[in-house]
UniProtKB/Swiss-Prot annotation:
Chief location bin: membrane
Protein name in UniProt: Protein translocase subunit SecA
Organism the protein comes from: Burkholderia cenocepacia (strain HI2424)
Entry's Gene Ontology cellular component terms: cell envelope Sec protein transport complex; cytosol; plasma membrane
Keywords, in A-Z order: ATP-binding, Cell inner membrane, Cell membrane, Cytoplasm, Membrane, Metal-binding, Nucleotide-binding, Protein transport, Translocase, Translocation, Transport, Zinc
Cofactor(s) demanded: Zn(2+)
Function summary: Part of the Sec protein translocase complex. Interacts with the SecYEG preprotein conducting channel. Has a central role in coupling the hydrolysis of ATP to the transfer of proteins into and across the cell membrane, serving both as a receptor for the preprotein-SecB complex and as an ATP-driven molecular motor driving the stepwise translocation of polypeptide chains across the membrane.
C-alpha cells in the first residue's frame, strides 16, 4: 500500500527512467537542424571524428547525443526511416545495458542501429544476436546500407560458413548472427591448436533480439559439441519392448497406504515431466529383463553391473510416456526431429540427450543414431554473461523482469508506444470439452470471415493446428497453416496474413520475426515477385505497382472490419508466449482484438485449475456449448501460469547453480589453453610438472624425512625404469653411502630426469621440442577435459540421491566436482610428463611425426555433432540433468608416438580390471591402461 502511494507521487522506476531519457532525447532533437545541414561526406566524416574522440578517452555516454543524432540522420537519408523519439529512448536503454520491452511493430530492428553504431565506434566489435539465420541475414543486409554509409563494416556469421569467412565476419565492426552460432564458435575457439585458427575476438557488447526467447526459453538447453561414443543400438531396441508391458499407476501412495486408485508399475508426474518405477514395477522389469537374458536370474537392477541398464529402462519409459509424436517431435525422412515447444519450429539436427533420442527412435522404429560423448558444452546463461556489456529487446519481457535481473543483472524498461494501442483483449471463454471449444472457435472464425476481418489462430502444437485445419476444411473455410512442417512457405504466408478474409493457423508465433500488416505486406509480396525469375521485367513492374495501388484500399477495409483478430485455442504455460500471440494484433496504433478459447481438457487447466473450474460449471448446471466468461476464472488461470513460471525459474536457477561449478572449471581450463596457444616456449611449465611428478613418485617409495628401513628402493628403481625411462642404480648409491638421505635420493633422481630431458632437447633443438611439448600438452588437456565432463555428467545424474542421506546435493556436487577437477589437473601433469619422458627420438623429423600422430589420434574425434540438447525435455529431476550421454573417451594418446628401448620399457600384460602394476591402487583400465 505504501509502495503504491509513493509510486503515485514519484512515479515508478520505469517512469522515472523514461523521463530521464526524454531529457537526452530533447538534447538529440536540438542537434537535428545542424546535423541535417551536413553533406553526405561530412556526415560520414563524423564517424572518424567520433573514433578519434573515443581513442582520446572520451566516454561513449558523453558521445551518445551526437552519435544518435548522426545515426538518425543517416537512417533518414539511406533507409528513408527517421527514428521516433520513443525509438531513441529504446536505443538508450540498450546502450546502458538493459532490456527494452517494445511492442510488436515498434521497429526494434531500427532501434538497435543506435546503440550498435555508438558502441562500434570503440573498435572492439558489437554482436547483434538473432534467433535464426534468416533473421540474421535479413537484418544484416537491410542495416548494412546504413552502417556502410557511416563507414562501418558489417559481417554475417552463419552456420556452415568457411573458417576464413567467419574470421572476416568477426573482424568487422558489427557482426550479425544467431545465438547458437556465437556459442558454438566460442566452444570451437577453445578446441583449436593454433592461435590463428580462432575466429572470435574478446566478447565486448551484444544486443540480443527476442531476448526472452534466447536467455529464458533456451536457458535450460546447453550448446554441446559431441563425438560418437560406444554403440548401444541393440540395447535400445530390446528395451523398447519393455514399456508396453508395464501399466501406469493412477494416484500417489500416501503415508497411510491410501491414495492409489489403480495399482501399476510406474507413476507419471506430468507437472514435473518425470516417470518413476513403483516397487512392483521394479520387480516386473527385473523379471522381464532376466527372461530376455539382459540381467542374471534374481539380480537387482541396482546391482553395480546393471546400473547402465537403469539408464536404458528410464529412457525407454520416458520415450513412451512423456514424449508424443506430432507434439514433441515429428518423424521425417526416417528421422525423429524435435519440435520446439516454444515456437513450434522443427529443430533439425538437434537431439535430446541422455539416450532419450535413441529411445524415441527405437519407439518409432527408425534408424537409431549412436550416442554421443560431450567434447565441449556451455549454457546460454554462462555464454552471454561473459560479454562486457549485454542488452536485449523483445515485445514481452516484463513478466520475466525478475529473472532477467536475478540471473543476468539486466533491468527491464518498458518503452512507451509511438501511438496509443487500440487492441481489445476480450475475456477468456472456458468450455467443458475440447469439442465445444473448437465449435466456438469455428463460429468466431466464420463470423470474422463473413465480415472480411483477417484472423490469426494460435495453437500450442502441430497436432492441434492440423486438427483445426481439418475442422476448417469441413466447415468450408479457406485457410493457411503455418507450423514447423510449413517452414519454407512461412514468409509468404505471414506476408498475406493481414489481407481481408484471410485465415491463418499458426503454432506459437514467437520469434517469427515478421509483422502482420493490415491489408497484407505489400513490400514482402513485391520482394517475392522481384525474386521470381520466370516473370518478365515489365510484368514485374506492373504487378508491383498494382500491389501498391490495391494496398491502401485493402488496408482501410481491414481497419473498418476491426483489424487483425487473434484467437488462442489454448493457454501456454508461460504468460509471455500468450502475450506474444496477442501482440501480433494492434501494431503501431492499428485496431485489433484477441480472445482465448479454453477447455477443461487443456493440460494447464487439467493440472492446475481444472477441478475448481469444473466444480463451478457443475454447480451452475451449465448446458453443453455454454462457456464461462469471468474475470475470476481468467485470474485463476494466470495464477496457474505464474506458478509454472516460478517453477521453471527455479529449475533454470538451480541448473545455473550446478552449471556454475563446471563453468568456473571451464574458465580455468580455457584460460590455461589460451596461454598455452600463445606461448612459444613452455619449458618452465614442463619442468615444474616434471619436478612435481618425480617428487611424488620418489616419495611413494622413499618418504620425506624417513630412514633407510622405511625405503623400498628396488620398487622405486623398477617404477623409474618402466614408467619414466630412468635406469638408475639407486641401491648401489645407498650401499655405498651409509649417511645418504631421502632428499639426496630425490635430488639424484631429479638430476637424472633433467639430464635425460636436456639430452632430448639437444638432439632435435629447443624450438622443435617446444612445439612437440605444446602439442602433447594441448592434446592431454583436451582429452582429460572431455573425460572430466563425462565424469561431471555421471556425478550430476546421481547427486540428488544424497538428499536421502540428509546431505545438501548442491554442496556435495560442488565438493566432489572440485575433487574430480583436482584429480584431472594431477592426471594432466602425470600424462604430459610420462609422454615427454618416454618419447624416443633421434631427429626433428621423428619428433614432428610423433606430434602429428598425437594430434590426429587425440584431437579430432570423428562425426562431431553440434547439439542444442534440451535438459528439461528429457524429463530428468532438476538436480539430475545431464549434458549428454557421456561415455569415457579412450583416445590412444601415445601409441605409435612412443618407442621403448629394450624389454624393460614394456608394460606388463594385465587384465583391464586387474590392479594396475604401477601401485596406484586403481584398476589397470583406469590408470596406465588408458595409455597402453
Amino acid at each position: 500500500m505504501t509502495t503504491g502511494f509513493l509510486q503515485k507521487i514519484f512515479g515508478s522506476r520505469n517512469q522515472r527512467l523514461v523521463k530521464q531519457y526524454q531529457k537526452t532525447v530533447a538534447t538529440i532533437n536540438a542537434l537535428e537542424t545542424q546535423i541535417e545541414k551536413l553533406t553526405d561526406d561530412q556526415l560520414r566524416g563524423k564517424t572518424d571524428e567520433f573514433r578519434q574522440r573515443v581513442a582520446a578517452g572520451e566516454s561513449l555516454d558523453k558521445l551518445l547525443p551526437e552519435a544518435f543524432a548522426v545515426c538518425r540522420e543517416a537512417s533518414r537519408r539511406v533507409l528513408k526511416m527517421r527514428h521516433f523519439d520513443v525509438q531513441m529512448i529504446g536505443g538508450m536503454v540498450l546502450h546502458y545495458g538493459k532490456i527494452a520491452e517494445m511492442r510488436t511493430g515498434e521497429g526494434k530492428t531500427l532501434v538497435a542501429t543506435l546503440p550498435v553504431y555508438l558502441n562500434a565506434l570503440a573498435g572492439r566489435g558489437v554482436h547483434v544476436v538473432t534467433v535464426n539465420d534468416y533473421l540474421a541475414q535479413r537484418d544484416a543486409e537491410w542495416m548494412a546500407r546504413l552502417y556502410n554509409f557511416l563507414g562501418l563494416s558489417v559481417g554475417i556469421n552463419l552456420s556452415g560458413m568457411e573458417h576464413d569467412q567467419k574470421q572476416q565476419a568477426y573482424a568487422a565492426d558489427i557482426t550479425y548472427g544467431t545465438n547458437n552460432e556465437f556459442g558454438f564458435d566460442y566452444l570451437r575457439d577453445n578446441m583449436v591448436y593454433e592461435t590463428d585458427a580462432r575466429v572470435q575476438r574478446a566478447l565486448n557488447f551484444a544486443v540480443v533480439d527476442e531476448v526472452d526467447s534466447i536467455l529464458i526459453d533456451e536457458a535450460r538447453t546447453p550448446l554441446i559439441i559431441s563425438g560418437q561414443a560406444e554403440d548401444h543400438t541393440e540395447l535400445y531396441v530390446r528395451m523398447n519392448a519393455l514399456p508396453p508391458l508395464l501399466e501406469r499407476q493412477i494416484g500417489e501412495e500416501k503415508a497411510d497406504g491410501t491414495g492409489v486408485e489403480k495399482p501399476g508399475d510406474y507413476t507419471l508426474d506430468e507437472k514435473a515431466r518425470q516417470v518413476f518405477l513403483t516397487e512392483s514395477g521394479h520387480e516386473k522389469a527385473e523379471r522381464l529383463l532376466a527372461e530376455w537374458g539382459l540381467i542374471g536370474e534374481g539380480e537387482s537392477l541396482y546391482a553395480p553391473q546393471n546400473i547402465t541398464l537403469m539408464h536404458h529402462v528410464y529412457a525407454a519409459l520416458r520415450a513412451h510416456t512423456l514424449f508424443h509424436k506430432d507434439q514433441h517431435y515429428v518423424v521425417q525422412n526416417g528421422e525423429v526431429v524435435i519440435v520446439d515447444e516454444f515456437t513450434g519450429r522443427l529443430m533439425a539436427g538437434r537431439r535430446w540427450s541422455d539416450g532419450l533420442h535413441q529411445a524415441v527412435e527405437a519407439k518409432e522404429h527408425v534408424k537409431i543414431q549412436s550416442e554421443n560423448q560431450t567434447l565441449a558444452s556451455i549454457t546460454f546463461q554462462n555464454y552471454f554473461r561473459m560479454y562486457a556489456k549485454l542488452a536485449g529487446m523483445t515485445g514481452t519481457a516484463d513478466t520475466e523482469a525478475y529473472e532477467f535481473n536475478e540471473i543476468y543483472g539486466l533491468e527491464t524498461v518498458v518503452i512507451p508506444t509511438n501511438r496509443p494501442p487500440k487492441r481489445i483483449d476480450k475475456q477468456d471463454q472456458i468450455y467443458k470439452t475440447a469439442k465445444e471449444r473448437y465449435d466456438a472457435v469455428i463460429r468466431d472464425i466464420r463470423d470474422c470471415y463473413e465480415r472480411g476481418q483477417p484472423v490469426l489462430v494460435g495453437t500450442t502444437s502441430i497436432e492441434n493446428s492440423e486438427l483445426l485445419s481439418h475442422l476448417l476444411k469441413q466447415a468450408g473455410l479457406p485457410h493457411e497453416v503455418l507450423n514447423a512442417k510449413q517452414h519454407e512457405r512461412e514468409a509468404a504466408i505471414v506476408a498475406e496474413a493481414g489481407r481481408p478474409k484471410r485465415i491463418t493457423i499458426a503454432t506459437n508465433m514467437a520469434g517469427r520475426g515478421t509483422d502482420i500488416v493490415l491489408g497484407g505486406n505489400a513490400e514482402k509480396q513485391a520482394a517475392f515477385i522481384e525474386a521470381d525469375d520466370a516473370i518478365p521485367a515489365d510484368e514485374k513492374a506492373r504487378r508491383i505497382q498494382k500491389l501498391h495501388d490495391e494496398w491502401e484500399t485493402l488496408h482501410e477495409e481491414v481497419k473498418a472490419a476491426g483489424g487483425l483478430h487473434i484467437i488462442g485455442t489454448e493457454r501456454h504455460e508461460s504468460r509471455r508466449i500468450d502475450n506474444q500471440l496477442r501482440g501480433r494484433a494492434g501494431r503501431q496504433g492499428d485496431p485489433g482484438s484477441s480472445r482465448f478459447y479454453l477447455s477443461l481438457d487443456d493440460p494447464l487447466l487439467r493440472i492446475f485449475a481444472g477441478d475448481r473450474v469444473r466444480s463451478i460449471m457443475d454447480r451452475l448446471k451449465m448446458p453443453e456449448g455454454e462457456a464461462i466468461e469471468a474475470g475470476i476464472v481468467t485470474r485463476s488461470i494466470e495464477s496457474a501460469q505464474r506458478k509454472v513460471e516460478a517453477r521453471n525459474f527455479d529449475i533454470r536457477k538451480q541448473l545455473l547453480e550446478y552449471d556454475d561449478v563446471s563453468n568456473d572449471q571451464r574458465k580455468v581450463i580455457y584460460q590455461q589453453r589460451n596461454e598455452l596457444l600463445e606461448a612459444h616456449d613452455i619449458t618452465e611449465t614442463i619442468t615444474a610438472m616434471r619436478h612435481g611428478v618425480i617428487t611424488e613418485v620418489v616419495r611413494q617409495f622413499v618418504p620425506e624425512g624417513s630412514i633407510e628401513e622405511q625405503w623400498d628402493v628396488p620398487e622405486l628403481e623398477e617404477a623409474l625404469r618402466n614408467d619414466w625411462q630412468l635406469d638408475l642404480a639407486i641401491q648401489e648409491m645407498v650401499n655405498e653411502s651409509s649417511s645418504i638421505t631421502a632428499e639426496e635420493i630425490l635430488d639424484a633422481v631429479m638430476t637424472a630426469a633433467d639430464e635425460q630431458y636436456e639430452a632430448k632437447v639437444a638432439m632435435v633443438g629447443r624450438e622443435s621440442f617446444s612445439a612437440f611439448e605444446r602439442s602433447v600438452m594441448l592434446q592431454t588437456v583436451d582429452r582429460l577435459w572431455r573425460e572430466h565432463l563425462a565424469a561431471l555428467d555421471h556425478l550430476r545424474q546421481g547427486i540428488h540421491l544424497r538428499g536421502y542421506a540428509q546431505k545438501n546435493p548442491k554442496q556435495e556436487y560442488k565438493r566432489e566436482a572440485f575433487e574430480l577437477f583436482a584429480a584431472m589437473l594431477d592426471a594432466i601433469k602425470q600424462e604430459v610428463t610420462r609422454i615427454v619422458m618416454n618419447v624416443q627420438i633421434q631427429s626433428p623429423e621423428q619428433l614432428e611425426e610423433a606430434a602429428e600422430q598425437i594430434e590426429e589420434r587425440g584431437g579430432h574425434l570423428e562425426n562431431v555433432e553440434y547439439q542444442h540438447a534440451d535438459y528439461a525435455d528429457a524429463g530428468a529431476p532438476v538436480a539430475n540433468v545431464t549434458a549428454a550421454a557421456a561415455a569415457t573417451a579412450t583416445a590412444d594418446m601415445v601409441g605409435s608416438a612412443m618407442t621403448h628401448s629394450g624389454p624393460g620399457g614394456e608394460m606388463p600384460k594385465v587384465g583391464r580390471n586387474d590392479p594396475c602394476p604401477c601401485g596406484s591402487g586403481k584398476k589397470y583400465k583406469q590408470c596406465h591402461g588408458k595409455l597402453s
